[in-house]
């Protein structure tokens, strides 16, 4: 039998908003890199306050990231009476064994926003470890699951492990909540992710609901601004979330801001500061239409791109531009760069 897991929250950060029940959600990022480096790609662990049943939002990073974070003491897994299922088994790499066991015990679901490699790479490579005794469920909108079946788990690019019972695919509908754990449900939204050689690309956003506290958390995959999209889709999300923000039931948004301000022709289906602020101004107007003052919203920024020849840290430039534009627009939003290996509870 496996030993019970106790996770210590090293480098702990608590974000609290007056009026909210504490610890409705836990967020822990395994990777927030927007490229072009292949390390630390998009993967965010989401759970309730107990951090027992964990959903991996995207799977660009997984097992190797867990090993690294355990090894570096950013994630401590204690209370082990046995590392493996087998007696008299010598464990050469304890961090590897703990990461394997943590994934096996706690992370049963991968919620995929879209099928670009930087969002699925880790989950695909690691799927060989799952096994029919501990299968994982891969959840997504229909176009995500169709792409994974046809173009990834197809016995060409990667074995069809669903046929071997290693993984189960689950399609979720954009018009209804679906329970993924005992306490958390999701409401999916399709979003635009630009176009490539004339073909429109789609991604996803998910509104998480804690069914016990009736609190919410909004998380985006890669997303294109409505202002440049062929069909505006983000507005539907802002409309759905505005009443929740007005009621102080939603305080945090995980959203990308890939680069400092650049021309629209170079965005390739991503946000930059001016477009993010513009979208949030629309959201704030919708919230204020309920006759309330906009509560301060926390935007956790992810998918920042890097370049070896940049003279300034892109995160610093992005934050500076966001704060300047936000101030000019009287936007009630706090921007934070999502930190890998750090717990957020709200």
UniProtKB/Swiss-Prot annotation:
It holds the Pfam family PDEase_II. It comes from the Eukaryota. Keywords: cAMP, Hydrolase. GO terms for cellular component: cytosol; nucleus. It catalyses: a nucleoside 3',5'-cyclic phosphate + H2O = a nucleoside 5'-phosphate + H(+). GO terms for biological process: cAMP catabolic process; negative regulation of adenylate cyclase-activating G protein-coupled receptor signaling pathway; negative regulation of adenylate cyclase-activating glucose-activated G protein-coupled receptor signaling pathway; negative regulation of glucose mediated signaling pathway; negative regulation of meiotic cell cycle. GO terms for molecular function: 3',5'-cyclic-AMP phosphodiesterase activity; 3',5'-cyclic-GMP phosphodiesterase activity. Its EC number is 3.1.4.17. Belongs to the cyclic nucleotide phosphodiesterase class-II family. This is 3',5'-cyclic-nucleotide phosphodiesterase. It comes from Schizosaccharomyces pombe (strain 972 / ATCC 24843). The gene is cgs2.
């Amino acid at each position: 039998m496996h030993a019970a897991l106790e996770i210590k929250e090293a480098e702990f950060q608590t974000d609290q908003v007056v009026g909210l029940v504490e610890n409705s959600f836990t967020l822990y990022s395994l990777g927030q890199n927007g490229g072009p480096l292949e390390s630390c790609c998009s993967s965010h662990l989401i759970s309730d306050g107990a951090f027992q049943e964990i959903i991996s939002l995207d799977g660009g990073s997984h097992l190797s990231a867990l090993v690294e974070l355990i090894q570096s003491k950013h994630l401590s897994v204690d209370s082990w009476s046995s590392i493996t299922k087998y007696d008299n088994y010598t464990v050469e790499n304890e961090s590897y064994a703990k990461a394997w066991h943590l994934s096996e015990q706690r992370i049963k679901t991968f919620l995929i926003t879209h099928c670009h490699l930087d969002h699925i790479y880790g989950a695909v490579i690691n799927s060989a470890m799952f096994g029919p005794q501990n299968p994982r469920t891969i959840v997504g909108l229909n176009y995500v699951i169709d792409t994974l079946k046809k173009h990834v788990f197809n016995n060409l690019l990667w074995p069809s492990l669903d046929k071997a019972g290693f993984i189960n695919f689950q399609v979720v509908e954009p018009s209804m909540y679906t329970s993924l754990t005992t306490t958390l449900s999701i409401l999916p939204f399709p979003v635009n992710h630009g176009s490539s050689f004339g073909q429109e690309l789609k991604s996803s956003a998910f509104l998480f609901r804690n069914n016990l506290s009736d609190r919410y958390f909004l998380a985006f995959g890669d997303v294109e601004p409505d202002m440049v999209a062929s069909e505006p889709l983000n507005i539907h999300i802002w409309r759905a979330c505005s009443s929740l923000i007005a009621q102080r039931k939603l305080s945090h948004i995980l959203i990308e801001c890939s680069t400092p301000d650049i021309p629209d022709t170079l965005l390739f289906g991503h946000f930059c500061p001016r477009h993010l602020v513009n979208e949030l101004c629309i959201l704030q107007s919708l919230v204020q239409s309920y006759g309330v003052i906009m509560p301060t919203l926390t935007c956790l920024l992810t998918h920042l791109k890097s370049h070896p020849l940049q003279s300034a840290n892109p995160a610093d430039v992005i934050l500076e531009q966001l704060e300047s534009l936000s101030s000019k627009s009287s936007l009630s939003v706090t921007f934070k760069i999502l930190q890998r290996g750090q717990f957020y509870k709200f």
